[in-house]
Amino acid sequence: MAAVLFALLALALLRAGGASAAAGTVTTSVQSGDSWVQLTCTLNTSAAGVTGHRWLKGKEVVKEDQLQGLHTEHNVTGDDRFGKYSCLFLPKDTGEATLTVDGPPRIKAVKKSEHANEGDSVTLLCKSESFPFVTAWVWYKVADSGDQVIQNGSQSRFFISHSEAQSELHIKDLDLTSDPGEYACNGTSLQGTDAAVVTLRVRSRLAALWPFLGIVAEVLVLVTVIFIYEKRRKPDEVLDDEDAGAAPLKSSGHHVNDDKGKNVRQRNAS
């Protein structure tokens, strides 16, 4: 008896789940032009009332409304229209569907120029903003004699790591002569290929010391100027002191002569 009741309960749950799934069925449509895409989702039936719609690109919400219709659209223009989208009918679990907009890969350098010191390590980074995802990454150094493909682990200094969305080139123990230049990252997907360029500049080990040496030189020049100025000023001060000391002696001599003259006149008068 218990087994029969369990079977009936399971059957009821399956029917309820099937009814719910049927109620949440969503049909999708993707229409595109040269630079635009129109995404459409239609909820066929719904046991519960729709309170709104939400559109996502990946995990980012790009549009949301509180309309109650069983139909929703999202229009996208520009180069960033490619990717994976989702439409959701609210409240949650009312209905949901996924739409994809395929396009050629668009490879971008996170930083178009990198600066590092000789002997240090540096990381060059490229990312892909496209769908389908990049399936193959290649790094090479741009040269007049021909592009040089960089293999992972080559010279024990070049290491490459990548995922579907980005690729990194790690260079260790930078060489001032051979490492500076332009590095290109190439990404290929089912829709095509694209590349971006990163310029690497390597500074000498002494480059960081130049500002400090400049400050030291300025201080030395200033000290030298002050020393010369003080040395030239001291003889003038000594001469001024000697002149000031001789003046009182000359004045006292005049007083002595005046006193002698008075005594002579007094004697003559007597």
From Swiss-Prot:
Cross-referenced InterPro entries: Ig-like_dom, Ig-like_dom_sf, Ig-like_fold, Ig_sub
Species the sequence originates in: Oryctolagus cuniculus
One GO MF term attached to the UniProt entry: D-mannose binding
Pfam family, one: Ig_3
Extracellular side: 22-207
Cytoplasmic compartment segments: 229-270
Record's subunit section: Homooligomer. Interacts with VEGFA, KDR/VEGFR2, PPIA/CYPA, SLC1A3, SLC16A12, SLC16A11, ATP1B2, MAG, L1CAM and AJAP1. Interacts with PPIL2; regulates BSG transport to the cell membrane. Interacts with XKR8; promoting its localization at the cell membrane. Interacts with SLC16A3; interaction mediates SLC16A3 targeting to the plasma membrane. Interacts with SLC16A1; interaction mediates SLC16A1 targeting to the plasma membrane. Interacts with SLC16A6; this interaction mediates targeting to the plasma membrane.
Superkingdom: Eukaryota
Stretches assigned to the Ig-like V-type domain: 105-203
Primary location group: membrane
Localization: Cell membrane; Endoplasmic reticulum membrane; Basolateral cell membrane
Signal peptide annotation: 1-21
Glycosylation site positions: N44, N75, N152, N186
Protein name: Basigin
Encoding gene per record: BSG
Span list, region Disordered: 239-270
Coiled-coil intervals: none
Membrane topology: Single-pass type I membrane protein
Disulfide-bonded cysteines: C41-C87, C126-C185
